[in-house]
Each structure stands twice: as C-alpha cells, then as structure tokens.
C-alpha cells in the first residue's frame, strides 16, 4: 500500500540520518528532516491520536547545531506526554530568533512534565552538549502548565550569515 511504502521511506530516512551523519554539527534543515522522519513513524503508530506542526522560517534553515539535538526532546514529548493522553496529542516544533539566539521550542499539549524526573537522560545529555559546545548562555529551559502543555526551549547562538 502507499502508506506502507511511505512508512518504509521515513524509516529509511530516519536510520540513514542516525548512521550516516557527516559530522557532529548539522544544519537545522537536516535536523528537522531527521526529526520529521521520526515523527511520521510515530504518527503511523498513533494515527489520528498524534498531530504534528513544524514552523521553521526559511532564513533559519541553515543555522548550525549539534546533530541529534531535537529527536531526544521530541521522543520525550511523545513518550512522557502525548502518549499518556486519552484524546489527541499535539507536538509543535518552532524556530525563531530572539536577540542573538536561535530559539527552538518543542511543545506538547499534555502538560505532564515532572521536574523530579528532570526529563530523563536524553534531555539532560542534550542540555549538557549545548552548554559544553556554546557556553552556559545556551541550553534547555522547561515551562509546564499541568494538564495544558509542556514547552522545552533550546537556546543556541544565532549565526548571522548562515547559508
């Protein structure tokens, strides 16, 4: 079927990105392609129970960031957030500029984040990698309104001439 063929294509993209990333640093466009393949696989699993929106302005597509920055955060949002909902889950990913930073927001509509769990190992590792690579001005912050949303915000330096 067409759906099975599409799923195989997304699996192929996801595994290729996992195995053959050319370097530790990738473009935001490449990272979004990787996370979108992952999201399409999850959408096949959850079907109409998972809605996804991506909002990345073209002028930010060539900003650089460490590979595998978004996928662990998105995986947490599904595993600890939307998959726990009885109704439909939503994952929203957006990129914007704020002052001299690239700001990436990953938000779910579950609002189930527990500070004691610290978001798990994946989120902690991403935060440590961002801070080690870019300094303590960068990293992850979490905002949660119980039963409404959890928003993970990643701050990275903005490259003025990325293209």
Regions found by a protein language model. Give the residues of each.
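Two-component histidine phosphotransfer core
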Residues: 1-143, 149-155
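Generic C-terminal helix-cap and adjacent flexible tail
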Residues: 157-163
